[in-house]
Amino acid sequence: MPSHRYRSVFDRVEVPLTDRTWPDQRFSAAPLWVPVDLRDGNQALAEPMDTARKTKMFDLFLRMGYKEIEVAYPSASQTDFDFVRSLAVRDDIPEDVTISVFTPARPELIERTFESVEGLPNVLVHLYTATAPAWRDLVLRGSRAEVLALIEDAAGLVAKLADQRLGTKHGPGAGRMRFEFSPEVFNLTEPDYVIEVCDRVTEIWDACADRPVVHNLPATVEVATPNVYADQIEYMSRSLARREHVILSVHPHNDRGTGVACAELAVLAGAQRVEGCLFGNGERTGNVDLVTLALNLHAQGVDPMIDLSDIDAVKAVVEECNRIPVHVRHPYGGDLVYTAFSGTHQDAISKGMAHHAARAAELGVPASQAPWDVPYLPIDPADVGRSYQGVIRVNSQSGKGGIAYLLRTHYGVDLPRDFQPGFSKVVQRATDEHGREMTPQDLWELFRTTYVVPGEDGAWKLTDTAFQEIEGGGHRVEATAVRADGTVIPVAGIGNGPLSALTVALAKAGIGFEVVDYTENAVYSEHAVSEGADAVAVCYIRARVEGREVWGVGMDTSVLTAMVRAAVSAVNR
């Protein structure tokens, strides 16, 4: 690889901060989130959104609770312009929601932008110009002084048009139009120059308590580790003039795959506002993902102030509008992010879920309100509208814990601990053979055919079975043993209990049968393992049959019948 062609970020831009304080900070509240999907995200789409798709996404933002939404680049296309105009005639936009529009520092484009927002009550005009050396030299073809003059003229025109729109500078509604400035490619711009530019814009726009200025500092192309960006943000936060009247904003991209980390460290460093896109759409590798950022806070006990309680509904709208699928492994929202295939993970999750339910009961609160501490699941999937059905799925990598969890949660069958390893091997052979995932229904059918069916149809059957309690607390059983070849053997036995009596009876048929372990549990009707019954007994017998240790399982509404079937299953297996 020709790595010698590239320079370290420290050779490209000065990073003057040495006494950083951001590493000692902690999150205590969410910043202002600003979705830019309708502008920055939209311009990165192969098929930009039409008005219908834009409207659908805008309505999603309102439902989620965003208070500032960048909606368009009105001077870039008639579609964007028309969309802003469509918002101006709506009467259902909440009064506390601000509409942001984006414009380059060119007079005719600024004027077109102001035309688009006529009639909108709460507007943020977002002005941008690239300030980094390569952009100044190659794109703008201007010196530092010339680019500063360009920005001053543009900021002055924005202020002038705003005053004209509002009637007088301090007249009624003057606080309802605010301004934002982005020194594009901030992270590669000389610190002294970006301070000079931003302070001049602050002065021209006369930042004050009633109308604070947003200075948005983009990592337009991510070029360094997140700590470098945090240093740059803290330096700006400590150096900007009228800081109390400046809302410091960040706009990270994800070229190095660390956009989320950049945004989080930037907030610790003083940023109060974050621009990004849902699920990280945007140019090249995308903008920072607002969903991940919000739920990272949620997972730390901080209210993100955004409603993601139905993440699949959010994802569906985003996928429809962007026409780009969300990856199955995307943090929090992917189809597989709450799913475990690994046996060790499944076992830990299964135990963690059982502990969580028990703890909630102990605290006397619903499980949805109990403190969450389940291995491998950073948040409760239910918090974002996911069910637990997909948490554990079975393939060739799965173990006994996951298999037992699925049968318990889907069918109410509580496999004895000592039973699980044997069934796990049965599942392993099946998954190795066909190489695909096993659904809960597949597991259930495999369980039935392996353990239950042999007790109902096999080399031996017991018919006409009748148990009787006899004097002294003992039990007597009479039955007919039928072999597959048609041989009929009447049998009977007496023992301390029904199972010991059955053992004696089987011996009368020439079957050496010794019980090693016996377990039973009830499966209730909501699990639907049978039709029309309130509860079904499931009996598990581990027996030594003709010297070989095997498990048998029986199911019936009668415990005694289930026990007999379990014994016959063990014999036939």
From Swiss-Prot:
GO terms for biological process: L-leucine biosynthetic process. Gene3D superfamilies: 3.30.160.270, Aldolase class I. Its cofactor is Mg(2+). It holds the Pfam family LeuA_dimer. One of its GO terms (cellular component) is cytoplasm. Keywords: Amino-acid biosynthesis, Branched-chain amino acid biosynthesis, Cytoplasm, Leucine biosynthesis, Magnesium, Metal-binding, Transferase. It catalyses: 3-methyl-2-oxobutanoate + acetyl-CoA + H2O = (2S)-2-isopropylmalate + CoA + H(+). Pathway: Amino-acid biosynthesis; L-leucine biosynthesis; L-leucine from 3-methyl-2-oxobutanoate: step 1/4. Its EC number is 2.3.3.13. It comes from the Bacteria. It is found in: Cytoplasm. Residues 31-312 form the Pyruvate carboxyltransferase domain. Residues 454-573 are annotated as: Regulatory domain. NCBIfam families: leuA_yeast, PRK03739.1. Homodimer. This is 2-isopropylmalate synthase. The gene is leuA.
